[in-house]
């Protein structure tokens, strides 16, 4: 069972003094996380293999003293969930704020309370600036879910807000960031830690192949099946930013948040997306299994969790925009002999879609290609034992389409903007757009 333990308050050596500390223990079947606070924002003091139930947390915390050297701040601290410049932190801060006049706000948070609310919620406050910050942690199998929420008594501008910041608790030697592009997805860039900051940001409003919101910490000898690995994923399909930093003290931190281009309006409450983290001692396969199990049990709708995944065939590369009922029937027959269980009709069946320069948004069957509609093809596909699927791209519109010509104000952005893939994006916040798409797609 997943367990949250609230240890009693105790005394232990943390920096060079004796400090009164709180500690909380979070357990999965294979991992233990110890969270502590010495009066400020909580921090992760331990994250590794599961500890015994009799582990002395005071003794454990006492085994993690900070080192001191010349030319640094006099008080050394662990990297907490949101280190701030107001605390004298000289690395990348976890929060950047300005008041209504653009003046910097340098928060100095004090720990207030920890509550069990669907997990653990840690509250810290800055009474002087009227700020409250909440760090929520919940357990999902072998995956930990982290999220930050900031509240302010007055409107402020948030230049940056990180999900709860995670230190490199496993002393990894390398990290893997994921990049790529179309037809070249999920390329692993395996890099060695070095002092300084690595920033990876998507400013395109989507996750993108170029800047996938994920990270893996590992050692040089970590393989698919053996060795230490920690996987991170920022659960946000829009613009995002990742910052990983090694400070001059040797400390390391991992930050994920929304792209800075999204933080330009005054607000009194803002939350990050959830960040999902899992540690494995069984290599890359271990974190893959943890995330896959989590997605199947808690992300997919319960109605889909145990359904079989049909092997499906997509006809795009076979025909592109040249649709013919005769050809598609022949292709479907070949597909079923190969073991396909679902046949998917891709782009080119609607509007006057003979190439990628027109008709997106005109979700009506092209009678030139399908004079009797799609029924003959669907019936044939079902008859030979396959499900039938069909391709839509409802959020997009072609400038050369009836939809755009009749409703040029339904797009995101200005009318004379640079196109991407010969298309524009519909503003799905507009009720008329929602109604139009629902009507057209449900009719098909």
Regions found by a protein language model. Name each.
Residues 25, 31-33, 42-246:
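Polysaccharide-binding surfaces and accessory modules of carbohydrate-active proteins
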Residues 30, 148, 267, 313, ...:
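Conserved, mostly hydrophobic/aromatic
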Residues 106-109, 262-281:
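Short Pro-Gly-centered flexible turn/kink motifs
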Residues 311-314, 345, 388-392:
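Hydrophobic faces of well-ordered beta-strands that scaffold small-molecule active sites
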Residues 327-349:
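Catalytic domains of carbohydrate-active enzymes, especially glycoside hydrolases
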Residues 349-377, 401-428:
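Aromatic- and acidic-residue-enriched carbohydrate-binding clefts of CAZyme catalytic domains
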């Amino acid at each position: 069972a997943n367990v949250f333990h609230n240890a009693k308050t105790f005394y232990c050596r943390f920096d060079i003094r004796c400090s009164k500390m709180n500690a909380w223990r979070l357990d999965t079947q294979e991992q233990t996380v110890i969270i502590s606070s010495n009066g400020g924002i909580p921090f992760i003091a331990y994250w590794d293999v599961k500890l015994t139930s009799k582990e002395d947390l005071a003794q454990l915390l006492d085994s993690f003293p900070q080192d001191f050297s010349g030319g640094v701040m006099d008080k050394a601290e662990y990297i907490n969930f949101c280190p701030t410049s107001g605390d004298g932190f000289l690395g990348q801060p976890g929060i950047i704020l300005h008041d209504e006049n653009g003046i910097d706000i340098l928060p100095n948070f004090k720990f207030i309370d920890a509550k069990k609310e669907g997990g653990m919620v840690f509250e810290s406050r800055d009474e002087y600036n009227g700020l409250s910050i909440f760090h929520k942690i919940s357990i999902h199998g072998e995956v930990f879910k982290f999220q930050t929420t900031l509240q302010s008594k007055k409107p402020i501008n948030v230049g940056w807000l990180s999900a709860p910041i995670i230190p490199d608790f496993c002393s990894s030697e390398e990290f893997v960031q994921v990049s790529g592009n179309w037809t070249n997805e999920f390329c692993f860039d395996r890099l060695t830690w070095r002092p300084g900051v690595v920033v990876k940001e998507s400013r395109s409003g989507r996750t993108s192949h170029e800047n996938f919101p994920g990270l893996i910490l590992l050692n040089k000898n970590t393989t698919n099946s053996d060795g230490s690995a920690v996987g991170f994923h920022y659960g946000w399909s829009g613009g995002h930013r990742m910052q990983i930093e090694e400070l001059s003290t040797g400390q390391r931190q991992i930050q994920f948040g929304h792209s800075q281009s999204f933080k330009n309006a005054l607000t009194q409450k803002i939350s990050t997306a959830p960040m999902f983290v899992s540690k494995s001692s069984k290599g890359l396969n271990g974190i893959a299994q943890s995330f896959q199990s989590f997605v199947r049990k808690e992300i997919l709708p319960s109605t889909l969790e145990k359904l079989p995944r049909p092997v499906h065939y997509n006809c795009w590369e076979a025909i592109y925009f040249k649709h013919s009922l005769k050809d598609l029937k022949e292709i479907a027959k070949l597909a079923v002999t190969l073991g396909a269980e679902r046949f998917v009709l891709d782009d080119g069946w609607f509007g006057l879609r003979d190439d990628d320069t027109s008709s997106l948004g005109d979700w009506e069957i092209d009678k030139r290609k399908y004079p009797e509609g799609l029924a003959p093809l669907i019936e044939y596909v079902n008859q030979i034992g396959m499900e039938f699927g069909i391709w839509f791209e409802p959020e997009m519109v072609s400038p050369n389409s009836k939809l755009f010509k009749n409703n040029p104000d339904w797009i995101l952005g200005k009318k004379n903007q640079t196109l991407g893939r010969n298309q524009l994006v519909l503003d799905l916040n507009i009720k008329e757009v929602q109604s139009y798409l629902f009507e057209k797609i449900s009719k098909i």
